[in-house]
A protein has these predicted regions:
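Long, charge-rich boundary regions
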Residues: 136-179, 187-206
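Conserved AdoMet/S-adenosylmethionine-binding subsite of the radical SAM
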Residues: 181-338
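Pocket-edge positions in alpha/beta enzyme catalytic cores
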Residues: 176, 266, 341-344
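Flexible, active-site-adjacent loop/turn segments at secondary-structure boundaries
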Residues: 123, 131, 167, 262, ...
Length: 367
C-alpha cells in the first residue's frame, strides 16, 4: 500500500547514491545487519550501576569504544551475538542509569535548566519525570527512503519557535497520554509489525524524553532501525548516550547563525551547539538533514548552512524544505516578525536548490 501512496519511495532505492549513503539502514531493513540498540544489550558493563557519576561516565567512554569495535566485527562478519541471559549490567542499562542521573539535574538539552525532574520538578520543557505521547502511526509523509515510518510523537519541546507548525503539542506538555518505557516499546513493536521501516522518535521533540526512550529499548526486541528526529539541541552528554544506539539521524538545521535562532526560537549558542551535534551524529550513523527554507533568511541561514554541510558532512543528504508557512505567534504578531510573516517564494527556493547543486549536496531524492 505504501508504495502505491509514495511511488518515489520505491524509486529512491534504485538510486545508487541513496543506497550508498544509507547503506547500513538498508541492510537493517533487509535483516542483513543488526540495529545498534540490540547489540548494546549484548555488551557487558563491568561496573556496579550505583557507582559515582564520574566513574560511570569513565566506563561509558571505554565501553563506547568497545561497542564501536563490536559493531565493526559484527558488520564485517555478518555475525550477530545472541543476548546473554541475565546480563543486567549491559551497555544499554549503563546509558539508562546515566540518563536518570541527568534527569535529576536536567541537562538533556543545552538549556541546562537543572530541574530535578526525578521528583517531578518541571524543567524548561514543563515536563517532570513522565513522558506523554500525542500520537503514533505509520507515517507516509517522511523522506522517501524512510516511509512507511513508525512515528511516535512526544509532547513538549525544548525550543520556543515562534512559527511552530506543531505548536498544539510542542507548547502543551499535557497533550496526549502518559506512556512509560514498556508502553513505548509496545507501540514500537506494533508499528514494526504493521510494516514500519524504522521507529521514528519525534515531537515536539524527543530530547526531554531521552530517559523514557532509552528505557523502552530494554523492552523492544525487533531488529528495526532506531531513528532520532530532533532539533538536535542536545547537550553533549545526551549525544554520548544516543551515539551508540541510534542508527539513523533526522536532525533539523534551522539557522545559520546564533542571532536568528535566539530571536525566533529563544535558544542561545544555536549554531555552535547544533553544528557540534551534527558532527557527532555524522560520526555515529547515517544522516538526513532537514533544512526549512524561511522567507528573508536565505542569505543569513540557508546558504551558510549548506556551505557548512558541504564542507563538514559531504556524505549526508539534505531535505531542502519549502513548506514554511507563518503559524503560531507569527500569525498573530505579524509586525513583530515581519521578516517571516509570509510563505517562502519560488525564487528563494530556487536560490536554495541552486546553491545546493553548486556545492555538490545530494538533496533531490529526499526533498
Amino acid at each position: 500500500m505504501w508504495r502505491l501512496v509514495r511511488p518515489d519511495a520505491k524509486r529512491a532505492w534504485s538510486d545508487p547514491e541513496v543506497v550508498r549513503r544509507l547503506f547500513r539502514y538498508r541492510k537493517i531493513i533487509d535483516q542483513e545487519r543488526t540495529a545498534k540498540y540490540l547489540l548494546a544489550k549484548t555488551l557487558e558493563c563491568d561496573i556496579p550501576l550505583d557507582s559515582s557519576s564520574e566513574e560511570l561516565w569513565n566506563v561509558h567512554k571505554e565501553d563506547s569504544q568497545r561497542f564501536t569495535q563490536l559493531l565493526e566485527r559484527v558488520d564485517s562478519n555478518d555475525e550477530v551475538p545472541g543476548p546473554v541471559p541475565g546480563l543486567e549490567r549491559n551497555f544499554l542499562n549503563l546509558k539508562i542509569e546515566l540518563a536518570q542521573r541527568i534527569l535529576a539535574d536536567c541537562h538533556f538539552c543545552e538549556r541546562r535548566c537543572g530541574a530535578d525532574r526525578t521528583h517531578d520538578e518541571l524543567g524548561w520543557c514543563k515536563l517532570g519525570s513522565t513522558s506523554r505521547v500525542s500520537s503514533a502511526f505509520l507515517h507516509t509523509g517522511e523522506e522517501a527512503p524512510l516511509v512507511p515510518s513508525g512515528t511516535i510523537f512526544f509532547s513538549s519541546c525544548c525550543f520556543g519557535c515562534v512559527f511552530c507548525q506543531n505548536n498544539d503539542i510542542s507548547t502543551n506538555p499535557n497533550s496526549g497520554r502518559v506512556v512509560g518505557p514498556e508502553g513505548i516499546a509496545t507501540i514500537a513493536e506494533g508499528l514494526f509489525r504493521d510494516g514500519a521501516l524504522n521507529i521514528n522518535y519525534v515531537g515536539g521533540d524527543p530530547i526531554p524524553n531521552t530517559h523514557t526512550i532509552l528505557a523502552s529499548q530494554v523492552h523492544q526486541t525487533s531488529n528495526v532501525t532506531q531513528l532520532w528526529n530532533s532539533n538536535l539541541y542536545c547537550s553533549e552528554e545526551t549525544m554520548q548516550l544516543l551515539f551508540d544506539v541510534f542508527d539513523v539521524w533526522l536532525p533539523d538545521f534551522k539557522y545559520g547563525n546564533n542571532e536568528c535562532a535566539e530571536r525566533l526560537s529563544g535558544v542561545k549558542n544555536y549554531f555552535d551547539v547544533v553544528s557540534r551535534n551534527h558532527l557527532i551524529a555524522y560520526d555515529s550513523g547515517e544522516v538526513i538533514i532537514r533544512h526549512l527554507v524561511m522567507p528573508n533568511h536565505v542569505e543569513c541561514c540557508t546558504i551558510p548552512i549548506l556551505k557548512w554541510v558541504s564542507e563538514n558532512m559531504p556524505d549526508c543528504m539534505v531535505n531542502i524544505m519549502g513548506q514554511y508557512r507563518p503559524e503560531h505567534r507569527v500569525r498573530h504578531e505579524k509586525e513583530r516578525f515581519s521578516d517571516i510573516a509570509r510563505p517562502v517564494t519560488s525564487q528563494e527556493m530556487e536560490i536554495a536548490s541552486n546553491t545546493a547543486d553548486e556545492l555538490g549536496i545530494y538533496w533531490r531524492p529526499v526533498s
